[in-house]
């Protein structure tokens, strides 16, 4: 009788255990597969529609239910680094086309192809219908530079907030005289820049001068040139220097140009 009762009790508990195990799998760290990534908010078909409309910028990664590998490692770093931005929320949606078909509604809404996972969309000002697709390499630096080009402020290595703002004003200025005045403002500001930051502040000024001499296409062509250089074998310190130069150049790219590339 006791044995029978034990079997009966175990049988009655099994549905509950199944639910608990499912929840544990869903929110387990990536080592055991699941959707919990430090710095990223996991969303589903319910929370997605609650979170996006209330946020200025949300970068959402749509991926398999249990992602892993190099691209996922890059995403983990990106999510952790997002703490530097007060206006950006990083989120992820896990999708499964079998079993319970987890979040397939969102996959269909945004016409996602599982062969292309991970897919990144930037949602702006709560707009659920017109997110911006990211088409670049799944690398932390590349995604950060793209986000910066979309108007998301990120405290990226090498970048100085005051000179980022000047770069934005410089690009928006419609006359040579106005741009020359902004360049002069930046030159005067060097006196108050920390010694450790003067090298990078000077880079902003150098780029402004190059744009005045060579035209609007300079930032894009210089980014392409440095991007190719980084692919070559070099010391970590040299690569870090070039990455900082790329980060600074991003401040001079127009949002319209970013949209056209997509």
UniProtKB/Swiss-Prot annotation:
Residues annotated with Phosphotyrosine modification: 66, 68
Function as written in the Swiss-Prot or TrEMBL entry: Does not seem to be a disulfide isomerase. Plays an important role in the processing of secretory proteins within the endoplasmic reticulum (ER), possibly by participating in the folding of proteins in the ER.
InterPro entries registered for this protein in UniProt: ERp29 (IPR016855), ERp29_C (IPR011679), ERp29_C_sf (IPR036356), ERp29_N (IPR012883), Thioredoxin-like_sf (IPR036249)
GO process annotations (BP): endoplasmic reticulum to Golgi vesicle-mediated transport; negative regulation of gene expression; negative regulation of protein secretion; positive regulation of gene expression; positive regulation of MAPK cascade; protein secretion; regulation of endoplasmic reticulum stress-induced intrinsic apoptotic signaling pathway
Quaternary assembly: Homodimer. Part of a large chaperone multiprotein complex comprising CABP1, DNAJB11, HSP90B1, HSPA5, HYOU, PDIA2, PDIA4, PPIB, SDF2L1, UGGT1 and very small amounts of ERP29, but not, or at very low levels, CALR nor CANX.
GO cellular component: cell surface; endoplasmic reticulum; endoplasmic reticulum lumen; melanosome; smooth endoplasmic reticulum
Location in or out of the cell: Endoplasmic reticulum lumen; Melanosome
Disulfide bonds: none
Gene3D superfamilies in the cross-refs: Endoplasmic reticulum resident protein 29, C-terminal domain, Glutaredoxin
SUPFAM superfamilies reported for this sequence: ERP29 C domain-like, Thioredoxin-like
Lineage: Eukaryota, Metazoa, Chordata, Craniata, Vertebrata
Motif stretch (Prevents secretion from ER): 259-262
Gene: Erp29
Protein name, UniProt field: Endoplasmic reticulum resident protein 29
One Pfam family matching this protein: ERp29_N
GO MF entries: protein homodimerization activity; protein-folding chaperone binding
Keyword field: Endoplasmic reticulum, Phosphoprotein, Signal
Cleavable signal peptide: 1-34
Keyword GTP-binding: no
Keyword Ion transport appears in the UniProt entry: no
């Amino acid at each position: 009788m006791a044995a029978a009762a034990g079997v009966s009790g175990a049988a009655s508990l099994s549905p509950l255990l199944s639910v608990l195990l499912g929840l544990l799998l869903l929110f387990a760290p990536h080592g055991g597969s699941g959707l919990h990534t430090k710095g990223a908010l996991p969303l589903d078909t319910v929370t997605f529609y609650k979170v996006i409309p209330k946020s200025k910028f949300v970068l959402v990664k749509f991926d398999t239910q249990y992602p892993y590998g190099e691209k996922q490692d890059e995403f983990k770093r990106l999510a952790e680094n997002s703490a530097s931005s007060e206006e950006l929320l990083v989120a992820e949606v896990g999708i499964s086309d079998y079993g319970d078909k987890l979040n397939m509604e969102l996959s269909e809404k945004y016409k996602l192809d599982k062969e292309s996972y991970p897919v990144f969309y930037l949602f702006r000002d709560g707009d659920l219908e017109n997110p911006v697709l990211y088409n670049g390499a799944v690398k932390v630096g590349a995604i950060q530079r793209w986000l910066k080009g979309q108007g998301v402020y990120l405290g990226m290595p090498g970048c100085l907030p005051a000179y980022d703002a000047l770069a934005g004003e410089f690009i928006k200025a419609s006359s040579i005289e106005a741009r020359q005045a902004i360049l002069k403002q930046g030159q005067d500001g060097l006196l108050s820049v920390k010694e450790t930051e003067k090298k990078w502040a000077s880079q902003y000024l150098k780029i402004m001068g190059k744009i005045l001499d060579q035209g609007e296409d300079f930032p894009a062509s210089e980014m392409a040139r440095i991007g190719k250089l980084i692919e070559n074998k070099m010391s970590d310190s040299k690569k870090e220097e070039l990455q900082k130069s790329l980060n600074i150049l991003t401040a001079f790219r127009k949002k319209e140009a970013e949209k056209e590339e997509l």
